[in-house]
Amino acid sequence: MRGSGPRGAGHRRTQGRGGGDDTPRVPASLAGCYSAPLKGPLWTCLLLCAALRTLLASPSNEVNLLDSRTVMGDLGWIAFPKNGWEEIGEVDENYAPIHTYQVCKVMEQNQNNWLLTSWISNEGASRIFIELKFTLRDCNSLPGGLGTCKETFNMYYFESDDENGRSIKENQYIKIDTIAADESFTELDLGDRVMKLNTEVRDVGPLSKKGFYLAFQDVGACIALVSVRVYYKKCPSVVRHLAIFPDTITGADSSQLLEVSGSCVNHSVTDDPPKMHCSAEGEWLVPIGKCMCKAGYEEKNGTCQAPSPVTNVKKGKIAKNSISLSWQEPDRPNGIILEYEIKYFEKDQETSYTIIKSKETSITAEGLKPASVYVFQIRARTAAGYGVFSRRFEFETTPVSVAASNDQSQIPIIAVSVTVGVILLAVMIGFLLSGSCCDCGCGRASSLCAVAHPSLIWRCGYSKAKQDPEEEKMHFHNGHIKLPGVRTYIDPHTYEDPNQAVHEFAKEIEASCITIERVIGAGEFGEVCSGRLKLPGKRELPVAIKTLKVGYTEKQRRDFLGEASIMGQFDHPNIIHLEGVVTKSKPVMIVTEYMENGSLDTFLKKNDGQFTVIQLVGMLRGIAAGMKYLSDMGYVHRDLAARNILINSNLVCKVSDFGLSRVLEDDPEAAYTTRGGKIPIRWTAPEAIAFRKFTSSSDVWSYGIVMWEVVSYGERPYWEMTNQDVIKAVEEGYRLPSPMDCPAALYQLMLDCWQKDRNSRPKFDEIVNMLDKLIRNPSSLKTLVNASSRVSTLLAEHGSLGSGAYRSVGEWLEAIKMGRYTEIFMENGYSSMDAVAQVTLEDLRRLGVTLVGHQKKIMSSLQEMKVQMVNGMVPV
């Protein structure tokens, strides 16, 4: 906070408008005004133009408490002394008043002119902003006024719960700031009919009372106050991940993040309430968690929608004992309709109803009573579940005819004949099906079960073919028991037939639903493309498509689809989502969600220094949440690195790359060999290198390296050290140094992840909790690791990168492609490598090295030189 009182005010200068193509010019019709004296018509014309050009809508995250441009009546402001500030009353083309105030006592000494606003309610906001638009005369353009003319004015505020507390003494007001103009106008500007309008914004907080007054003090300037806008900022209500986050007023501190819990949209649920964080600038940051649509509903445009009800039902043939109906598919099926459920009952007997299921849009209900009214309702079922029933439709069966009533004597004969026929038919069916009864679920029952209870045949077949998809089941997978509600990772390699694993965990997609647009990379087995996926009844989605190259072997196909078998078991917002596979046509494809920003390491390198610490922590939190999910399922990733994290346009990070098989060989580089090449050991825990012991704890070590990559914006871990040197240094206790400008809390978490004893490393759920605490308390991230402690944890020698490897400062700078700074270094006394080795980050800024990327490159090289100069540092 800035300011001279007990409460301060930050300030931000937004714009000043002056000459050039964008400069507003006074219309020719008003040119006559400018030949008038300074006071009166001249200012009136000038200010009228200014006001008309600045009636702009406020951004959606700003809520106005006062806008003098929109007040229709009297502002109620008070000026004293009365011959100081003067209100100029004009109207625009719609006859709405334009409120402007001017003062120009530049020829008189000791000016002290005050303009007081009426009481302004803060509406619960603890930090408010004041936007001023004004014009100011250049003192040099006023003959005879140089000794007394000023080019600034002062702004004050006073907090009060009293709406009528105008009796405030001058010394009770707290100064917000002295306001100066970016541009002032001269006599020449008046001749050219050019208006120069300044815009200044200041903020005040924290506020503790219900409202406040503003005051403007003139001390001898020639100024016109065109408009005053007072507002606070909020994070506007938004729906994110099927959760509604309400309007949230920002906090009092400019660095404060407010944690806000969201509520799930209708027909969606979650285990833990989703959260987002409202920044001081009115932006939603760091989304955590999401809601999921309930069974029977599907996500569409931020809502959970069920299949729309059947609305158009037509009656077909109606008889005394049956009614035939037909209907049209719902307007919004929200997916492929699998079947319809028809519920009907005799009117006024709703408790006794019958259900018919049909895959067609027509049915015939039989066995009804003559001359009776029946009520029908229909609903559709998709893969997401059932929709809502339609409204009730009533139809009446026909009465019994007279001829039929005279033939009642024939009914017993017909009934006996039908009964005998049914029994004979049941006996025949029983003998025919007795050998296959066990296959359909009757167990050891003999053929007699079919004879004695013909209905069992139907039930047996129904339970096999018509099993309710929502019924809870217990599955056995190659010796693994999968209980309802317990998600456990199942290794696809335990399946005798790998294709079974693919079909178990991945959805088959028709190739015709996929449109490939462009190639975005090359994978281990073929090209990686971006494209679109359009499934029937669903909206089109952008997707990434991995293809299997032509001429593949069966083993390559099995390995390629193995990743889909793994990925298909995961369902988490921070794990890459598998849309499905194409295996019944060529090319064989794996289809996943599309992540616009690609791999995290490349993205960070392209955007070096562009994110706040909170945004970086939000990325790390997402990765940790994804890894916690994998750890809870019993899955060990083994290859966690920034290159295997994908990031979308909302900066949400998702763990990917589940398809690599790893075999540790006797390699001089101590690398893991895979089908696609070698994975460097820089991300791998020491026990995994030495004993092939991969656990969630070894993933935690890798996560610490990912943290280092993120905070250093994609820098290569251990720089150009060889793998052998890295293994040796880590075994001896050396650890990576803190990245530049790294919060101490984050670096300490990295060191915790790099504990040699894997049992001493934090669990992923603990890491998520630690990062949540940092996000809720941003001030804890302000303490940075100092330069000396950064060097103390540096790794052992980096070969020939020390100061002795370069003969001059110029040669060193050229070697790291920073030769442009050679002359600056020499001019400031850094003429030897020994002198250069003592340079700090502050020195670089003082020398004019302002680009963050250049600072990092030079400091990294200097740190490496220091390592060689001390010839081995103290282990962690």
From Swiss-Prot:
- In this protein, the active site sits at D639 (proton acceptor)
Q: What is this protein called?
A: Ephrin type-A receptor 5
Q: How is this protein annotated for GO cellular component?
A: adherens junction; axon; cell periphery; dendrite; plasma membrane
Q: Which organism is it from?
A: Mus musculus (Mouse)
Quaternary context: Heterotetramer upon binding of the ligand. The heterotetramer is composed of an ephrin dimer and a receptor dimer. Oligomerization is probably required to induce biological responses. Interacts (via SAM domain) with SAMD5 (via SAM domain).
Here the disulfide bonds are none
The record ties this protein, via SUPFAM superfamilies, to:
Fibronectin type III, Galactose-binding domain-like, Protein kinase-like (PK-like), SAM/Pointed domain
Q: Which Pfam families match?
A: EphA2_TM (PF14575), Ephrin_lbd (PF01404), fn3 (PF00041), PK_Tyr_Ser-Thr (PF07714), SAM_1 (PF00536)
**Which gene is transcribed and translated to give this protein?**
Epha5
Question: A biological process (GO) annotation for this entry?
Answer: negative regulation of cell adhesion
PROSITE patterns, sorted: EGF_2, EPH_LBD, FN3, PROTEIN_KINASE_ATP, PROTEIN_KINASE_DOM, PROTEIN_KINASE_TYR, RECEPTOR_TYR_KIN_V_1, RECEPTOR_TYR_KIN_V_2
Q: Any idea where this protein resides? A: Cell membrane; Cell projection, Axon; Cell projection, Dendrite
Task: Give every Eph LBD domain span.
Answer: 62-240
- What tissues is it present in? Specifically expressed in the brain. Highly expressed in hippocampus, tenia tecta, indusium griseum and piriform cortex. The highest level of expression is found in the CA3 region of the hippocampus and the pyramidal cell layer of the piriform cortex. In addition, elevated levels of expression are also found in amygdala, medial septum, nucleus of the diagonal band, and in olfactory bulb. Expressed in pancreatic islet cells (at protein level). Expressed in myogenic progenitor cells.
What region holds the Protein kinase domain? 514-775
